[in-house]
């Protein structure tokens, strides 16, 4: 009789647990002394086999009830829950477009990423073909939560990589335009979003703070010009015009766009030679003035 009443009390505990899982597991966890231990005296059983069987049966039911309580309890200490942020899925990743001229001697590498939201990019490849380019290879890789797509492209008429800086800028703007078209949520993270997107960027980059210009040695025949500044439509073409005004030749360019920031590299020369120190300083000053020109023009009046 004592054993039967013990089984009954556990069953009742399970029943009350189903109706009130939170309070039941709280009582069990916080106040274990309040739960009476069942009477398992061997004298209540006819033989040793019945005793062992009774204990195992009770133990099994107890374990099942505890597992059931852990699954259904909302404040169980054994199974803590970690609330997921409501806007985890609403965070818009940073769009990135990189045009690499050094990775492959035969082709221009275009790499773009937008978290894990990019698809097959069929329309982007079609748009590149409209520029007279051939996509000879495409690869997709994943690093953590970021999906990166790479295209190897060449000029259709020559079969060689793209060297013309104007065409490189067209490639960049074409890709960004497709991003804005098929992923309009990225508009507030791109400079072109202010003109062509559904929502202009909320955060404005201070041009004075963001602008860094350096000229480095890159052999006797050319120099490496590195520019980091706030991005804007047509930036590369305009910078090349500034260089042409001081008779600097642009041999090739690498163009990277990381959200609102442009990070560009140009291989430049003057009359077939690398830039000396004084000419490098003239170039840096001209570019710095051009990049700050909107504010300078206003202040000059």
UniProtKB/Swiss-Prot annotation:
CDD domains, sorted: ACT_UUR-ACR-like
Transit peptide, start-end: 1-57
Keyword tags: Chloroplast, Plastid, Repeat, Transit peptide
SUPFAM superfamilies with a match to the protein in the record: ACT-like
Annotated GO CC locations: chloroplast; chloroplast stroma; chloroplast thylakoid membrane; plasma membrane
Domain ACT: 109-189, 224-294
Predominant place of localization: plastid
Localization in the cell: Plastid, Chloroplast
Function: May be involved in feedback regulation of amino acid metabolism.
Protein name per the record: ACT domain-containing protein ACR12
The encoding gene: ACR12
């Amino acid at each position: 009789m004592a054993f039967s009443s013990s089984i009954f009390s556990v069953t009742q505990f399970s029943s009350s647990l189903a109706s009130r899982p939170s309070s039941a597991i709280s009582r069990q966890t916080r106040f274990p002394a309040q739960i009476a231990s069942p009477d398992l005296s061997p004298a209540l059983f006819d033989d040793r086999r019945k005793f062992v069987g009774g204990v195992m049966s009770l133990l099994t039911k107890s374990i099942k009830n505890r597992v059931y309580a852990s699954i259904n309890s909302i404040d169980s200490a054994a199974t803590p829950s970690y609330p997921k942020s409501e806007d985890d899925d609403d965070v818009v990743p940073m769009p990135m477009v990189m045009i690499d001229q050094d990775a492959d001697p035969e082709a221009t590498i275009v790499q773009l990423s937008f978290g894990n939201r990019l698809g097959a990019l069929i329309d982007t490849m079609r748009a590149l073909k409209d520029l007279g380019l051939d996509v000879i290879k495409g690869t997709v890789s994943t690093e953590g939560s970021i999906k990166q797509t790479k295209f190897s492209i060449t000029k259709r008429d020559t079969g060689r990589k793209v060297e013309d800086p104007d065409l490189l800028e067209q490639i960049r703007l074409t890709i960004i335009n497709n991003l804005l078209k098929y992923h309009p949520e990225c508009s507030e993270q791109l400079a072109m979003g202010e003109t062509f997107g559904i929502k202009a960027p909320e955060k404005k980059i201070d041009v004075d703070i963001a602008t860094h210009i350096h000229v480095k040695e890159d052999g006797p025949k050319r120099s490496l010009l590195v520019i980091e500044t706030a991005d804007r439509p047509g930036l590369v073409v305009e910078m090349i015009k500034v260089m042409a005004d001081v008779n600097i030749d642009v041999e090739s360019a690498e163009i990277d766009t990381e959200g609102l920031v442009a990070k560009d590299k140009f291989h430049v020369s003057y009359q077939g030679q690398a830039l000396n120190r004084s000419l490098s300083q003239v170039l840096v000053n001209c570019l710095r003035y051009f990049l700050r020109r909107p504010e300078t023009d206003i202040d000059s009046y």
